[in-house]
């Protein structure tokens, strides 16, 4: 495999698996995580056989009572856990003390964030991370191709 072979195979994202999301002033393009799992499975085989991940989890307690969960995710490939890449961290707020609210899915979401970051460094969905799928221009281009992937 040449240096760019994997990257070139996995860098393009099917627009039907992305969406624009926003949290306050922060806006970005989100990729469906199940689509990402399918994409890496297409390249390396079934999870647990051709590829997989290891993760660590840490809970960080802040002075104001908030708690964050951080997961470090490493990907291994070729059924050889010695061929490992990472860790890449994902972080989510687990407990919001001000609202007295627990985010039960935060640990899972932190792992998903770490997995997405790890995959991005291998070239998966590079078009998203390079900003090629952001904003109205992309949506208009896709509509012009007969695809109604607009946001």
Language-model features: locations:
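Interfaces that engage single-stranded nucleic acids at replication/repair/recombination sites
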Residues: 2-5, 137-151
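N-terminal, Lys/Arg- and Ser/Thr-rich interaction peptides
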Residues: 1-37
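Intrinsic disorder/low-complexity signal
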Residues: 1-4, 13, 65, 112, ...
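Positively charged, aromatic-enriched nucleic acid-contacting surfaces
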Residues: 26, 31, 36-144
């Amino acid at each position: 495999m040449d240096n760019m072979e994997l990257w070139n195979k996995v860098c393009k994202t099917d627009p039907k698996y992305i969406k624009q999301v926003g949290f306050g002033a922060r806006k970005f393009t989100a990729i469906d995580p199940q689509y990402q799992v399918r994409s890496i499975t297409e390249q390396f085989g079934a999870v647990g056989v051709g590829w997989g991940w290891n993760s660590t989890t840490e809970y960080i307690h802040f002075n104001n009572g908030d708690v964050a969960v951080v997961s470090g995710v490493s990907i291994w490939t070729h059924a050889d856990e010695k061929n490992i890449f990472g860790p890449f961290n994902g972080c989510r707020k687990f407990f919001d003390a001000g609202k007295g609210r627990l985010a039960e899915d935060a640990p899972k979401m932190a792992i998903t964030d770490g997995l997405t970051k790890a995959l991005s460094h291998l070239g998966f969905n590079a078009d998203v991370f390079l900003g090629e799928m952001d904003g109205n221009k992309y949506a208009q281009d896709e509509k012009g191709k007969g695809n109604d992937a607009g946001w």
